[in-house]
Amino acid sequence: MESWSRCLERLETEFPPEDVHTWLRPLQADQRGDSVVLYAPNPFIIELVEERYLGRLRELLSYFSGIREVVLAIGSRPKTTELPVPVDTTGRLSSTVPFNGNLDTHYNFDNFVEGRSNQLARAAAWQAAQKPGDRTHNPLLLYGGTGLGKTHLMFAAGNVMRQVNPTYKVMYLRSEQFFSAMIRALQDKSMDQFKRQFHQIDALLIDDIQFFAGKDRTQEEFFHTFNALFDGKQQIILTCDRYPREVNGLEPRLKSRLAWGLSVAIDPPDFETRAAIVLAKARERGATIPDEVAFLIAKKMHSNVRDLEGALNTLVARANFTGRAVTIEFSQETLRDLLRAQQQTIGIPNIQKIVADYYGLQIKDLLSKRRTRSLARPRQLAMALAKELTEHSLPEIGDAFAGRDHTTVLHACRQIKLLMETETKLREDWDKLMRKFSE
């Protein structure tokens, strides 16, 4: 509806744009005779719209379309002429009304590319979806850098819960949405309704809980919401950009609660997984690219899945626009600037600094000639990371480490690869450092 689009544009000049994006953009408008039906994904959004925006919505829709009657309903805009199911104004979530708690149905386990870096996280999300509320994985916390698939797995788990039991009420929220809703409820003195909505769902999925850091009242309300859901054996799935105990500003009691269930890290994908992701994403787009092009992207883009997708999208778009075949030469030409920016972001000096900080050393220690174990291992690890994450040759890496010979760098890379197969601590250090480069 054109009138609805104009209504949203006007509202963005009257209310904070982030509020319009969070609470009003999810609504789907449909004209039915002398009324406009606004479809919301869940009762929580309907209640907020009814309390804060409905009066102004009626005024604007009347102005732009001449229709003043506005009906709120749960669901999606129907493709047929059937009438919508009106919202139950008693505040109860009827099991006969389809409930869509902001879940993106595009994300599922079938289109999630599994690799060593995310294998455990995928298995944990699958178990949570199959047995929601089981204490072995409640809460389930997925943590790791940006663009590694945490939200994908969260959506996939929620979608499976709905497939197994269509009446299951799964709500997904970004942490900012939880915070914004709570602030509005405090302002409107409607905290009882705020709490009731969360207590009536079967599963709660919240993204990026590090956003709660330093927000005492938000943590207070989430703490009580967590307890109510946990005691009711309702599944809780959360994501964070790092292990919660490393997040400054989170209350100790909340950190303790988060440790009750299962916490699983998602690490940056290895080369094989990156290549598989590129090929899978290309198939999703109906594009065909040679394996060597997928290998090129996987080799150059190391940090996260979003960077891989960005490179692929750029490549496919230019190929479609120019009509040229996707060859290695075409790919190198198209992605030149993107790859150069990636290399500038992760340079050898940056690697040296991050490794030195991680081990509590100074960069001059890594570059020194001393061969004590406390220095030799971090130095070898830094060299191996430089080989993995940059396009520098072995001699160039050696030069960056105080003029060491290329054979020294080669030995370091082989040694680290060999030791990671048997030394759990070294493998953990490698994974943690790789996560830092994906942040």
From Swiss-Prot:
Q: Where in the cell is it found?
A: Cytoplasm
**Which keywords does the record carry?**
ATP-binding, Cytoplasm, DNA replication, DNA-binding, Lipid-binding, Nucleotide-binding
Q: Where is this region: Domain IV, binds dsDNA?
A: 320-439
Q: Where is this region: Domain I, interacts with DnaA modulators?
A: 1-75
A Pfam family reported for this protein in Swiss-Prot or TrEMBL: Bac_DnaA
Q: Where is this region: Domain II?
A: 75-101
- Name the positions where ATP binds: G147, G149, K150, T151
Q: Where is this region: Domain III, AAA+ region?
A: 102-319
> Molecular function (GO) terms listed?
ATP binding; ATP hydrolysis activity; DNA replication origin binding; lipid binding
Describe the family membership recorded for this protein in Swiss-Prot or TrEMBL. Answer: Belongs to the DnaA family.
Record remark on domains: Domain I is involved in oligomerization and binding regulators, domain II is flexibile and of varying length in different bacteria, domain III forms the AAA+ region, while domain IV binds dsDNA.
Q: What protein name applies here? A: Chromosomal replication initiator protein DnaA
* Species of provenance: Xylella fastidiosa (strain 9a5c)
Classification lineage: Bacteria, Pseudomonadati, Pseudomonadota, Gammaproteobacteria, Lysobacterales
